[in-house]
């Protein structure tokens, strides 16, 4: 495997349960929807993620432009499994990015160009109200496009995060033959988990008005898990030939 570089970021991850047909038709053959089996998000079949990138660095240490070194974007993806090989991967089908030219995220240069990632005007308001060791966090994030908006609003009591090491495989539905391997060292604060009976969420709203996503966000979606990752160090790798 070839190391492409690293990313230092924070992330909000919302795991949802939505209608299966709308997801399956977005996957290339021979991939199938494979709901999350992890304890905190068991049964979820869609993830909506917001990334705040503090720094991207190439493996060679090359200096990147501001637009490439920093970033804000929403990612929509489906936990999936290959029908024949049984490989599991997170299949990304749409990214809304603040990058001025709508470039793919770091590590995906020229892959599925123009078919997965689109530019959006992304605004964020993040506040913390702290009293001794207690903290209440309010976060509002919006991605504005010509045809609609993705708007996320949450208010929660901050918990004590766990430090976790993880590894996962990511593909784009538009060119699923390419794969990236992400190895991460992260802090994980599970704010809400239906399977684990955790709920420190004081307020929540997710509004998606884009026509291309109305078959997914039809009002029947259910939140299974909401996790905040205030610190996330990810190394990005490309397998040989990937």
Tell what function each PLM region has:
Residues 1-59, 200-242:
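Hydrophobic, proline/glycine-rich low-complexity stretches
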Residues 48, 76-78, 154:
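Hydrophobic beta-strand residues in large extracellular and virion-surface proteins
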Residues 53-140:
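Aromatic- and glycine-enriched beta-alpha-beta binding-site module
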Residues 104-242:
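Interaction-surface and assembly-scaffold signal
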């Amino acid at each position: 495997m070839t190391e492409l570089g690293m990313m230092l970021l924070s992330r909000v991850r919302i795991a949802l349960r939505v209608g299966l047909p709308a997801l399956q038709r977005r996957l290339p053959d021979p991939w199938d929807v494979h709901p999350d089996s992890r304890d905190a998000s068991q049964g979820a079949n869609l993830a909506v993620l917001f990334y705040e990138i503090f720094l991207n660095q190439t493996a060679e240490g090359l200096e990147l432009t501001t637009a490439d070194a920093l970033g804000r974007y929403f990612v929509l993806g489906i936990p999936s499994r290959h029908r024949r090989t049984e490989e599991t991967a997170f299949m990304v089908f749409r990214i809304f990015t603040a990058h001025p030219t709508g470039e793919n995220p770091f590590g995906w240069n020229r892959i599925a160009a123009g078919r997965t990632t689109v530019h959006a005007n992304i605004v964020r308001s993040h506040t913390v109200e702290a009293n001794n060791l207690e903290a209440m966090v309010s976060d509002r994030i919006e991605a504005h496009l010509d045809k609609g908006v993705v708007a996320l609003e949450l208010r929660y009591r901050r918990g004590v995060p766990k430090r976790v090491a993880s590894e996962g495989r990511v593909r784009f539905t538009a060119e699923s033959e390419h794969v990236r391997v992400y190895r991460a060292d992260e802090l994980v604060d599970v704010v809400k988990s239906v399977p684990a009976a955790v709920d420190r969420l004081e307020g929540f709203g997710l509004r998606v008005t884009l026509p291309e996503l109305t078959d997914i966000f039809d009002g029947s979606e259910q939140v299974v898990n909401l996790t905040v990752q205030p610190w996330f160090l990810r190394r990005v790798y490309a397998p040989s030939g990937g």
